[in-house]
Curated annotation (Swiss-Prot):
Keywords: Disulfide bond, Protease inhibitor, Serine protease inhibitor. This is Bowman-Birk type proteinase inhibitor 1a. Inhibits trypsin (IC(50)=2.7 nM) and alpha-chymotrypsin (IC(50)=322 nM). Belongs to the Bowman-Birk serine protease inhibitor family. Dimer. One of its GO terms (molecular function) is serine-type endopeptidase inhibitor activity. The keyword Transcription regulation does not apply. The keyword Disulfide bond applies. GO terms for biological process: negative regulation of serine-type endopeptidase activity.
Amino acid sequence: GDDVLSACCD
């Protein structure tokens, strides 16, 4: 979605 924190280190 719009979660930069989640997309950060995936």
